[in-house]
Curated annotation (Swiss-Prot):
Source species of the chain: Methanosarcina barkeri (strain Fusaro / DSM 804)
InterPro entries: Chaperonin_Cpn60_CS, Cpn60/GroEL, Cpn60/GroEL/TCP-1, GroEL-like_apical_dom_sf, GROEL-like_equatorial_sf, TCP-1-like_intermed_sf
Gene3D superfamilies: GroEL (3.50.7.10), GroEL-like equatorial domain (1.10.560.10), TCP-1-like chaperonin intermediate domain (3.30.260.10)
This protein's encoding gene: groEL
Subunit comment: Forms a cylinder of 14 subunits composed of two heptameric rings stacked back-to-back. Interacts with the co-chaperonin GroES.
Role according to the record: Together with its co-chaperonin GroES, plays an essential role in assisting protein folding. The GroEL-GroES system forms a nano-cage that allows encapsulation of the non-native substrate proteins and provides a physical environment optimized to promote and accelerate protein folding.
Name by which UniProt lists this protein: Chaperonin GroEL
One CC-aspect GO term: cytoplasm
Documented EC number(s): 5.6.1.7
Keywords from the UniProt entry: ATP-binding, Chaperone, Cytoplasm, Isomerase, Nucleotide-binding
GO molecular function: ATP binding; ATP-dependent protein folding chaperone; isomerase activity; unfolded protein binding
Main EC class the enzyme belongs to: isomerase
Localization per record: Cytoplasm
Catalytic reaction list: ATP + H2O + a folded polypeptide = ADP + phosphate + an unfolded polypeptide
Amino acid sequence: MASKQIMFDENARKALLNGVDKVANTVKITLGPKGRYVVLDKSTKPVVTNDGVTIAKEIELHDKFENMGAKLVKEVASKTQDNTGDGTTTATLLAQSMIREGLKNISAGANPIDVKKGIEMATENVVGYLKSKSSEVKGKEKIVQVATVSANNDEEIGNLIADAMERVGYNGVITVEDSKTMETNLDVVEGMQFDRGFVSPYMATDSEKMVCEFEDPYILITDKKINSMKQIVPVLEKVASEGRSLLIIAEDVDGDAQAALILNIIRGALRVCAVKAPGFGNERKEMLEDIAVLTGGQVISEDKGMKLEEFDDYMLGSARKVTIDNNKTIIVEGKGDKAKIKERVSLIEAQINIADVEYKKTELKKRQAKLGGGVAVIKVGAATETELKEKKMRIDDALNATKAAVEEGVVIGGGISLFRAAAILDSLKLEGDREIGVKIVQRAIEEPVRQIAENAGKEGAEVVATIRAEPRELFGYNAKKDVFEDLFEAGVIDPTKVVRSGLQNAASIAGMVLTTEALVTDFNDEKDEKAATIII
């Protein structure tokens, strides 16, 4: 085992804070409608972005102890992104403030465990306050407002997302892809989504977003388990000879078959992704038939006297595009016969009418919605590739935020919902150092307002003082217009889930850092640096 270096107590906490500050200070300049951009140096060309989690993920520090702190605050951003898809910058800022103030108090003699407990109790109270102030999202206007704010106040994006939700429903499938022109527009096409992701992360074509995207793929559908390459060699030979990609939907793909597929993917010999079939039992068979009708393929099943080894071309389906991640698969514009798709939807409708069990009716309605509901495709256009990537990131953020708003409602934006929550913590009286934890949260939840103001070129302390002096709950600073006003009336709103999740994740990581007494890592020597460049 390699020898390790260890750091204790004050020195350990100081190193962690240095790492936290380097990430948070880089990320927080992007907060608000007048936040700045950060340029990331990529291997191909620089990327310009103001997306918090994208920036945080790019930061790797030379000092290994500081890098631990950086990784912890990156975890706040990543976890918030996974939960809600937005609010990563606010979460990072909250974590930095809690960690900085907490370490200051611990250095002065406060008990770390009690401070952590105080932070947890204060966070719980603030979350309760946010939920009590949350308003349900009703109507297109509110959807436009949420999407616009999350897209860095781009009204075009806000309207596009609202239109997309109006056409496919709040829970409908909405995808984002490149446009062949400079225009950004919306199109609704036939498609389907089901809750099954790839069987191995090695199948992702984009390792940053952890998604697999194929244009014009073949689709192999079977209700059998694939555990040997021999079963699918004829299919793979056809796909490879035509230079096409392949999506495999099967009961499972494991053993030698999965290992061989991954090896060929890594070597670049095949472009293949495998997912488990959706549903269970008879429901699975019906869902596979739905996919087959949509894509113009056949379900290869021994029930029909068909075997994978006896594959024929007509058994393969296809689609214009498929997108697969860890949890779901989206098929866009299946190449199936439109008349047969309508016929299949009508058949499901007839089954709904005669179903006598409520559960069965519900499942049939879900299948009908998936097959007949369609997919909204936002096609993003821009003058340059750099602008295109940045715009797609903003649309993804806005889309995720809007879905979060539909789920848990909205609260007043501009950092005001958290700012006003500070007052309710005055009544939370705790003993000893737990009270310090409450004060740390009180200070932290004022930071977003302060930072939004500073990014807009204002004096943060003055803006905070002006808002504090005004008793109206909805009163705040609108950085976009550079005015103080009723923010709810102005349409400055945030999804409750985004604000809540960011606060909880920040408090969780802050508690871990504040109770840390030692750091253990490898020595930062030349051998480590060389190892990073070795390819095996």
